[in-house]
Amino acid sequence: MQKIIGALLIFALLLTGCRYNTPREKQEDEKKHSKIELYSAQDDELLQTIDNQDTVNKLLNTSDWEVIESISDDLKPEYIMLAYQEKTLLYGQDPNEARDYELIATVITYQNSSYIKEIISSTVIKNMIIPENALIFYYAMPDDIQEDLHELIDE
């Protein structure tokens, strides 16, 4: 009996040490892709679709931006950016198959202003009901990001 328990204990220890490690490159490839559709606020014309991940991340990373409590009602919208992200890969789905995108945020820029309004899509937060005004944020967009955005539009 002691031999069986000892063998099971050794077997269990061996199994816990034999964990499969995914290479870092493969993990990075499996990240969800994002894209931005950039529209004119005046006529809702699609100006550009941005799917370069570095550019998307740069335009949407608001972590270092100045948070503003509110913005003036006098500001006129200039551009509307719709940010999309690939839907989560579900069990049984082929990882090589193209996935649909879901809207995660709407960002509105304003004429002659560095202020933006970010509206987080309520579909991003699953299984919770959050008031709509809790999903709206205002920021002052840094000058370099603003310049990058205008360069993308002028291309």
Predicted feature residues:
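Hydrophobic alpha-helical segments, principally membrane-spanning helices and signal/leader peptides
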Residues: 1-2, 42
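Function-determining sites in protein domains
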Residues: 19-155
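C-terminal motif of bacterial Sec signal peptides marking the signal peptidase cleavage site
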Residues: 14-17
